[in-house]
């Protein structure tokens, strides 16, 4: 493959070949906040063009870019644009709109209005009209981050473990139920508001490494594991080379 897509998130690194207008088979691994294993970097593919999106720390981003520049003839880094591929961002200053949210909207663009919920380090929610107009969104802590924050302030509360229950009868289950339930409630409230605002039903797309535990609680949701990479593929095919 001559063109590849790279998505460097806060805690996971994903990449895939550009396959037409979509992402091909995805490879992914976790990374530290400030570093990535040297062996992992040395195993990256090579080709003609690398299309890169990053919300990771500046130092880690530059290290990955430096590695890619030794493997590709051209490395293109995505920046959020006011408009791309029929999507128009609601932010007055598009540079303040995260590139991961931007690409998720590009990947979600279709013939129906959609609410896009990304569950990673943060929980991000964005509403996109059928005409491609972004109607804004929300940012909150994801369930994983909620658990970590509670553990940091009250060490006796475990950072992981437990199963969801509507009314839990032990601490581990209560923590999972509260944190997962808070995320689901915010998504559901946003979905209801979007439907009222747009005057029609709104589809729900969910993506991100923290999404699978929420899916049983969101029966109408469609899970799109490669949504950001699909959006990056859209950006790659719609934006002119610098």
Swiss-Prot record:
SUPFAM superfamilies: Actin-like ATPase domain. The keyword Isomerase does not apply. ATP binds at residues 7-14, 121. GO terms for cellular component: cytoplasm. Substrate binds at residues 91, 98-101, 171. Its cofactor is NH4(+); K(+). A monovalent cation. Ammonium or potassium. Pathway: Cofactor biosynthesis; coenzyme A biosynthesis; CoA from (R)-pantothenate: step 1/5. Its EC number is 2.7.1.33. It holds the Pfam family Pan_kinase. Disulfide bonds: none annotated. It comes from the Bacteria. One of its GO terms (biological process) is coenzyme A biosynthetic process. InterPro entries: ATPase_NBD, Type_III_PanK. Keywords: ATP-binding, Coenzyme A biosynthesis, Cytoplasm, Kinase, Nucleotide-binding, Potassium, Transferase. PANTHER family: TYPE III PANTOTHENATE KINASE. Catalyzes the phosphorylation of pantothenate (Pan), the first step in CoA biosynthesis. Homodimer. NCBIfam families: baf, PRK13327.1. Belongs to the type III pantothenate kinase family. HAMAP family: Pantothen_kinase_3. This is Type III pantothenate kinase. It comes from Xanthomonas campestris pv. campestris (strain ATCC 33913 / DSM 3586 / NCPPB 528 / LMG 568 / P 25).
């Amino acid at each position: 493959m001559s063109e590849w897509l790279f998505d460097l998130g806060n805690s996971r690194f994903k990449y895939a070949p550009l396959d037409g207008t979509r992402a091909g088979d995805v490879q992914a691994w976790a990374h530290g906040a400030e570093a990535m294993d040297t062996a992992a970097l040395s195993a990256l593919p090579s080709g003609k063009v690398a299309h890169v999106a990053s919300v990771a720390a500046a130092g880690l981003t530059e290290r990955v870019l430096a590695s890619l520049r030794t493997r590709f003839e051209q490395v293109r880094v995505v920046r959020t644009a006011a408009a791309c591929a029929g999507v128009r961002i609601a932010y007055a200053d598009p540079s303040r709109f995260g590139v991961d949210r931007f690409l998720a909207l590009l990947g979600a663009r279709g013939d129906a209005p959609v609410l896009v919920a990304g569950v990673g380090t943060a929980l991000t929610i964005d509403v996109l009209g059928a005409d491609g107009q972004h109607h804004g969104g929300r940012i909150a802590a994801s369930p994983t981050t909620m658990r970590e924050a509670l553990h940091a302030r009250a060490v006796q509360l475990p950072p992981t473990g437990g199963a969801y229950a509507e009314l839990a009868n032990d601490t581990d289950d209560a923590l999972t139920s509260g944190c997962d339930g808070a995320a689901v409630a915010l998504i559901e409230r946003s979905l209801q508001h979007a439907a009222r605002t747009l005057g029609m039903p709104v589809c729900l797309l969910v993506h991100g490494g923290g999404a699978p535990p929420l899916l049983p609680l969101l029966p109408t949701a469609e899970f799109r594991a490669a949504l950001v990479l699909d959006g990056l593929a859209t950006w790659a095919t719609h934006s002119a080379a610098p």
